[in-house]
């Protein structure tokens, strides 16, 4: 235990397109939307996370809300760095310190990420005082978080449906054997709902409202055993310009999301078709694991199961599976050395 260790804090970050989660001392200390609000005149960041999220779609011309990450990678370097820095500073246990501690971090990244994008993540972390920064691929982190022993010579298939990307991977012996990353996930579902409301109901709804619709009545199939109640949605009537309200059922949302879900199914099928036969035999027995917020879409597990003829399981607390895995990798750096990218 050197002096450096005493001054170092360990944190695990799931830098997501929709939400950023941070683990410190084995607890999720930050779980907030990946969004910042910037003052256009001074260029200052005035709010981040939940506070900025409440401003979304309600700002005047001097304030702009930005989502620094797009499709799982950093789109706005400056905003993402400020966001990470402000979120880390708001961790209660680190606030009390007299000076800023050096950080040892494990950050998860999408599997389809390029070298340049990877460097952007690393640099962002180094600028907020990250002395040791390790990266881990999202499907790998999800597998560890679900509780799969990834070091075994046994194939497991993970489908992680996040905000920006859906990561599909077959994992064995602590490595990714075949993977596919498609840019269809929670955000696309939200946009599908906005488009559906416009075209079918002549109702203009904002992103936040569409997000609520997705959570309350979102579905992947049109015949659920326990259907949610219809939801009343308020927005602007495109014909009259007046605010109006319509009722939306889960069947409509299932229709709205059908095409996007089909593309996720196709990606799953494609990954299965690239899987070596021995691992395919394992997957036939173990099934497919779903993680990420998108996996909470009602009936999605059933739909993928019907398409693949395989059992499909949803991780417990799927929203936090990835950050849990990232935190476990941080705790056992030696054990998971082979899956971490230095």
Regions found by a protein language model. Give the residues of each.
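Nucleotide/phosphate-binding catalytic cleft detector across ATP-hydrolyzing
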Residues: 1-161, 169-288, 295-342
